[in-house]
Amino acid sequence: MKYLKFFFIFIIATTLGICAHFALPRTAPTKLPPSYAKSSVLLVPLDSRPVCSSLPQKLGQLAGLNVILPPKAYLDNYKTPANKEKILQWLQINKKYYPYSIISADMLLFGSLLEARQRIATPAEETALLGKLATLTKSQDEKPVTIFSVIPRLLVSDELLPDRWYAYQLLRYSEYHDLVRITGSFALTQKMRQTEKKIPPEVLQKYISQYQQSDRFNLGLLALAKKTPNTKLTFGQDDASPFGLPHASAQKIKAAIYSKKLQNKAQLTYGADEIVALLIARCFLQQADWQPKIYLAYASTQTEQSVMPYMATTTANALANQLALLGAQQVAAPENADIVCYINCGTDKNPPGKNQAQEVQKLLEAGYKVAIIDSSEDYEPQQLLLPQLLKYNVSINRLTAYAGWNTFSNSSGTALAQAVIFAARLRQLQQTGADSKEIIALYAQNLNFTLERILEDYYYQKTIHPALRQQLIAFGNDPTKLDETEKQAAQNYIQSKLALNAFTLLHTNLGRTPFYSDGSKEYYITSLAVSSSLPWNRVFEVDLDVWTSVGMK
């Protein structure tokens, strides 16, 4: 009986300890006003994936912009291309009603990014689309339009057979071809010819033709922009490297921009999926008539000049390019900045740790608006900054922005877009003497967006997705070709894991400190709910939403 008594005391003490560990501060529920759109943007997305459709819409909501997409029935669904004709008709009908349009040329030419990687458009198709775009922009020339087009990526599509069997040889050929173009080296020419012999002629010709077709069409877009005063262009260099046929295409576009004197109307950037986020942010900054000042803080001395996977340039060059696209200004000191952008490019040899976490916490405590770009060389969680922020109890609820998905440019473009939109919207509210509840609501709305990125970019992409993929393969299922039963089982698994992650995040970090204080009152996140689904019959991406409640103390 004596030992039983001590056992019950131990159980009760342990239970109380766990409850105390997960307990949140006591607060009074607070109802915040909803946000309303002040303007609208018409968007023809790159494809229907959430990062190209719902993410831009959520960024638009943060900016007070209603981002309007074509009907879902018109859009692509994984391997089924979009109904291009229906989308073009929708655009022709609706464009005149909205002040600004962002149009993916790849969607209108191919029906999706995936289709653009697998099919080569004919000259007749290009000419027809350019003609329709010319009519569209001329007939509504008082309404600004930005058209964006993506240069084919370096690696051949995994969906193409037998092409993907020669992916490595095609990559090497592409790099040698570009280096020979630049240097004229006889030795490199010999290596290029040796590599060429290892590739079937029809496979090589198809690969080269992709870039020839892209060059031809993009030069046509430049000619179109030359004739239409309110048409701007953005060209993206998708999944590339410092040398290769994509780099050669980018150089052709750059030369054409200068020769046609279109520097104020056309830009080249590094990436694809994040382009719309940057363009929406640029649109809002132009409406707000504001140029934000950005200070770039690197997690290590190696970060600035590192070339991350699938990037055609260094992190410093990529960031300078995106700041120019936004119309933002880089400054040399944090005290002169509206936003401090903290950049991690973790590697096995140089992972982030306690020092980096403390640097971020000091910036937050000093009152800076801190946006984090969290990238990793091998897409491994131990190379990311976020786990270190959680380990050392950094107040992640005070971050202005966070992104850590896929490539470096995907992450940097998303984080920069969120940060400048939030800072510009806050500035607007403060200048117009908005009610304090509106400012608190903006902070809460921005935190919602940040939490979606944390739950998706870190918890799903870096922890749940790899484990789920391995399980599917172990049971003989293809993670890229799920049937409906497999998809539902995968969704149930993902939802249960994300719900647990959200609960843990709320009770161990997010809800324990205020996300906003006005000097007399503090505001806390008191609940965090998450819902998720697979947009396509594969596990590569997830469609994710979060809901939070706010309490006042």
Task: Please provide the spans of the model-predicted regions.
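Positively charged n-region of N-terminal signal peptides that target proteins for export
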Residues: 1-5
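Short amphipathic alpha-helical "recognition" segments used for binding
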Residues: 6-9, 195
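Hydrophobic membrane-insertion alpha-helices, especially the h-region
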Residues: 8-21
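An N-terminal assembly and electron-transfer interface module characteristic of large anaerobic redox
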Residues: 25-553
